[in-house]
C-alpha cells in the first residue's frame, strides 16, 4: 500500500501537536492529560490541517473552555510546527471536537449492561446437558 505525502505529513503533525500540547502549552484552561489528538486530515496541497481533538471530561463547559484555549494557542502551535517540521508552507490549523471515543465508551457500557452470558459458559452448559 502506497502512502501519500499528505498521510505522512499528517502523522508527523499529529505527533508534534501531541508533544506541544503535553509539554509546551502553559494555559491554565488546558488540562493536557485529558486532551488527545485523534486524527489529522491534511489537504492535498498541505496548506490546511483539520485536527480532531478528543477531550476526556464530562463537564461540557470545561470542554468548551479547552477548545477556546486551543483556538487561542493556534498562532503559537503553528509557529512551533513550522520550527519542528520542514515544510514549504506551514498548514493553517482547524480544531474539531471528536467525541468518537466517548461514544465508543458509551456503547461498551450499554453492551456490558445487557448481561449476555459469555460463550465459554454456554459451551460448558451444553456439554453438561449432553452427558446426561
From Swiss-Prot:
Location, primary (coarse class): cytoplasm
Domain of life, source organism: Bacteria
Gene Ontology molecular function: ribosomal small subunit binding
Annotated compartments: Cytoplasm
Gene Ontology BP annotations: maturation of SSU-rRNA
Gene3D superfamilies cross-referenced by the UniProt entry: 3.30.300.20
SUPFAM superfamilies: Ribosome-binding factor A, RbfA
Family: Belongs to the RbfA family.
Official protein name in the record: Ribosome-binding factor A
Organism: Caldicellulosiruptor bescii (strain ATCC BAA-1888 / DSM 6725 / KCTC 15123 / Z-1320)
Lineage: Bacteria, Bacillati, Bacillota, Bacillota incertae sedis, Caldicellulosiruptorales
Gene: rbfA
Amino acid at each position: 500500500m502506497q502512502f501519500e505525502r499528505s498521510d505522512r505529513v499528517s502523522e508527523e503533525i499529529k505527533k508534534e501537536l501531541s508533544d506541544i500540547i503535553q509539554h509546551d502549552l502553559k494555559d491554565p484552561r488546558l488540562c493536557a492529560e485529558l486532551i488527545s489528538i485523534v486524527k489529522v486530515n491534511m489537504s492535498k496541497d498541505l496548506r490546511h490541517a483539520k485536527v480532531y481533538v478528543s477531550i476526556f471530561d464530562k463537564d461540557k463547559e470545561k470542554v468548551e473552555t479547552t477548545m477556546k484555549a486551543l483556538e487561542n494557542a493556534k498562532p503559537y502551535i503553528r509557529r512551533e510546527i513550522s520550527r519542528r517540521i520542514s515544510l514549504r508552507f506551514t498548514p493553517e490549523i482547524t480544531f474539531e471536537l471528536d467525541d468518537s471515543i466517548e461514544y465508543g465508551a458509551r456503547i461498551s457500557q450499554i453492551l456490558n449492561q445487557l448481561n449476555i452470558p459469555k460463550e465459554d459458559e454456554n459451551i460448558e452448559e451444553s456439554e453438561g446437558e449432553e452427558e446426561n
